[in-house]
Amino acid sequence: LMCDSTNAERKGFTQSERTVGHTFDTIFHEHQGSRLIIATFASNVDRVQQIINTAHKYGRKVVVEGRSMVNIIDTAMNLGCINIPENTLVDIDRLKDYPDDRTVIITTGSQGENMAALSRMASSVHRKVSIGPNDTIIFSSNPIPGNEKAVTRVINELEMKGAEVIFQDVHVSGHACQEDIKLIYSLVNPKYAIPVHGEYKHLVAQA
C-alpha cells in the first residue's frame, strides 16, 4: 500500500468536506450585498459543487474563470460528475448584465500564481473583472508550503482595493490525518507499506 503522508504529523481525523458547505452558507447569508469571488483548487470538483449549490440557493449566477477551472468543470459536466442547475452558469462576458449582489465568480489563483485569474484581478490587469469595495474574496484553500508570500501579496493587493478578504475556516484538507492513516492500514492490512507524497519529515512520521 502506498499511502499519502502529507498530514501524517496531524492528529485525529481530517474534517469532512460538509463543514465547508456550512461555512459557505454562512458567508453567502452574511454578504448578500456583495459580489463574491471564490478562489479554490480547480481539481476540487466537490468544493466547486458546494459553491454552485450555495449560489443557486441564494439566487446568484455563477461565473467560472481561469483556464484550468473552466476545463475541469467542462470535463466534470460531460462525465456527469457535477450538477449545475439550469440558468445558473453564465459566461464572464455577461457578468456586467447582473448586479454584483447576484453573482459569484469561481476562480483559479488560490496559491498566488502570477498568471492565474485572481492574481490578474488583484493587480488590475484582468480584462473582465475589476476589484472594488463591493467585493468579498474567499480563499477556499490553504497555502501550499512555499506559496505563503505569493498568497499574502495577492491578499494585500485585494485589500488595498477595498475588498474584504476571507481566508479562515473555508477549507478542509484533502489529505489523511493520523487516524485516517491508521484506519486505512487496519482495513487493507497490506503486506508492504510505502509512505509517499510529502516532505521527508512527513514520510518519517507515517513510517
What are these regions (language model features)?
Residues 1-207:
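Acidic/His-rich, metal-assisted hydrolase cores and their charged scaffolds
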